[in-house]
Amino acid sequence: MESKVIWSDVLRSWLPKANIFVRMFVNHCQRDGITVSAGHLAYVSLLSLVPFIMVFFTILSAFPAFSEVRGDIEALIFGNFIPTSGDQIQGYVAEFVGNASKMGAIGILSLVVVALLLISNIDKTLNRIWQAKSERPIIFTFAIYWMILTLGPLLIGLSVIMSSYLVAFANSAEAYTMGATTAMLKIVPFIASVCAFFILYMIVPNKRINPRHALVGAFMGALLFELSKKGFSFYITHFPSYQMIYGAMAVIPILFVWVYLSWIVVLLGAELTHVIEVFFHEESKENFTQVDEDDPQSPA
């Protein structure tokens, strides 16, 4: 009986706070116009897709250790991050990258600039969500962009190698633990998504971010990303009306819609991280004020 009373009191104390938190989250999403920002980033992403992937694999090709896992990296990118039509899109992108690689030094440099512009747009959008007033020095900003562009491919390559080792280990343990390989294949992409969201929310904002808040936002972003992939794949598979309308060109709207949904997920995770920080900051100020008012020795 006492436990029921305790849980009832806990619910009464937390329900109003949960209501305030949800309203704050919705208001922040509406204020920042994440649907409009996601559309802008989706458009820029599609324009930057070929330059970014070309720079990505050019950096990887400089390291012979990653040459053997290039196919696995492509499968990771197009299989896990683009549900359905991944093989078709992969073929188109590979052809575009092959054509772009025949360009001269000036053309390749322009592709690098386009890839950096994509990172710049992501940076500005996330900093607008966090309301970062101060701007970084240009040299520092360029250094961060370049670090993301160069270290990003290396981190993904290392994650693929580690995933291969984990899956191989799971295969060897399959005889002792049934379903180990299947579980590993499901867990590793999710953990990789959480790490990617966490790094994004920690590094990009020009503010000090609490790692715990960023981890919550990263976990929610990765969860929404996985659910979006399942839902999008289900819709594409069971309601193929887009193929009747667009025919052979159906892959283009599919890719655009998926990139748009992906950016909405990224921005929702960023908003959640920011709202958690604002909510706990306001709550701590309210608690401090309440304690100060209840203290009889506090100055009038």
UniProtKB/Swiss-Prot annotation:
GO terms for cellular component: plasma membrane. InterPro entries: UPF0761_bac (IPR023679), Virul_fac_BrkB (IPR017039). This is UPF0761 membrane protein Patl_3954. The lineage of its organism: Bacteria, Pseudomonadati, Pseudomonadota, Gammaproteobacteria, Alteromonadales. Belongs to the UPF0761 family. It comes from the Bacteria. PANTHER family: INNER MEMBRANE PROTEIN YHJD, UPF0761 MEMBRANE PROTEIN YIHY. It is a multi-pass membrane protein. It is found in: Cell inner membrane. It holds the Pfam family Virul_fac_BrkB. The keyword Zinc-finger does not apply. The chain crosses the membrane at residues 46-66, 103-123, 138-158, 184-204, 214-234, 248-268. Keywords: Cell inner membrane, Cell membrane, Membrane, Transmembrane, Transmembrane helix.
